[in-house]
Amino acid sequence: KFYYHMYGATINRLNVFNGNCTVFTKLGHQGNMWMYAEVTVFVQNNITFEGIRGYSYTGDIAIDDVSLMEGICAGCKENLTDSFGHLHITYSAKFSPDCTWTIRNSSISEPVAIISIEEVQFAYCRGYIKVFDGSGAQIFTRRGCNENHTSNTFLEITFQESQNVTIQVSLENNQSYARFGYGILEGGLESALLLPGWNASLENKTSTSLQLRWMDISSWLRDGLRFFVVTAKSSYSNLTVKGLFSSNTTFAEISGLDPYMAYDVSVVAVDGDGSQFKSTVLQARTDEWVPSRAPSVFVTSVTSTSVTVQWNPLPQQYHNGRLLGYRVFIRKTANSPFPLDESNVAVYNTSWVTLNNLKPGQPYEVNVSAFTSKGDGPRSTHYIVTTAVCGKRPTHSTLNCRRHSSTHQRLALASNATDARW
């Protein structure tokens, strides 16, 4: 805790450091008065105050009554006593690093806390989120330098003897924020009982999300509704995506899913006593998307007028839908004196194609992409190949010289795919 005084037109900046980390900063004229500040820190060797002078003498910075005390700043901690809620944590002038929000259990036996980290944005690497169980063990951490930052992280945490779970957040400026949902239930989601006759239906879908609607069961449960949890479990892996929703809705969108993936979807209702009831399982598949990888490409035959291009079939996990075929792109290299516009051909049911009627001794760029009904995936890296020169035998193909009447020619295709077209 400390007081500071920053008065004058040419005031610059006051900084406070915990070790090498900035924990407080104030810039410019603050009025002819003493201001109070408190910051929660885990002390790293030294606390340093730095006053940076302005460009003139008409500005003074002073500090007074500095104290260091154990504990969390009173204005930087909050107790959450409801069994369901949402937090939208933003930076403000009163925000101090390492602020805490403690979820406390009131009357639910064998309580388990659900924490849904919905969205996080850190302006600096030193921002973070930490979650601790009732014994003080750190269950989860995310720091500002992690790949940002829409999260969909879903935690189930046992309360332990202290009957609380703590969220600790450090934000550094007003571009930083964090959004959470939380709820308390008895036991865990795996203990939910099937509620006969309760169904969910698929309303819409994208390549990464499913939109669901379910029957209103508010009158079915004697102890009322507190919140819903929607789970989408992949049919091909142990990955489960979960979302937390309020009791006044019968619609939800689950995002962060994989394209063209089958999921077992169910809705869990939690009543006022923390008991859970689940709907029948709905099987749903996300929409297709473009392939996420490019095939690896190589050339198997080169003559003076043709190139045979071959590629390894794209592995199934990168299809993101029904793979319709491959697209082969060819063009003269950028340093060609007579550049030719890029041409491409779609190839079906095969992994090779021969490109004919090329110019002898000409360098070409070739690459390949796979495609679904949603479009082309990424292209392979450029494969540079030069056709043979008449009178010289290529190292890995037979010589095939032809007379060319024009520099610009139409490319022809020969492959075992009869429906391919330029």
Swiss-Prot record:
Keyword Repeat among UniProt keywords: yes
Top-level taxonomic group: Eukaryota
Domain Fibronectin type-III, chain residue ranges per copy: 2-74, 196-286, 291-386
Domain MAM: 1-75
Tissue: Component of the acid-insoluble and acid-soluble organic matrix of the aragonitic skeleton (at protein level).
Matches recorded under PROSITE patterns: FN3, MAM_2
Keyword set includes Repeat: yes
Keywords carried by this UniProt record: Repeat, Secreted
Compartments it resides in: Secreted
CC terms in the record's Gene Ontology section: extracellular region; membrane
SMART domains: FN3 (SM00060)
Gene3D superfamilies listed in its UniProt record: 2.60.120.200, Immunoglobulins
The protein's name: MAM and fibronectin type III domain-containing protein 1
Organism ancestry: Eukaryota, Metazoa, Cnidaria, Anthozoa, Hexacorallia
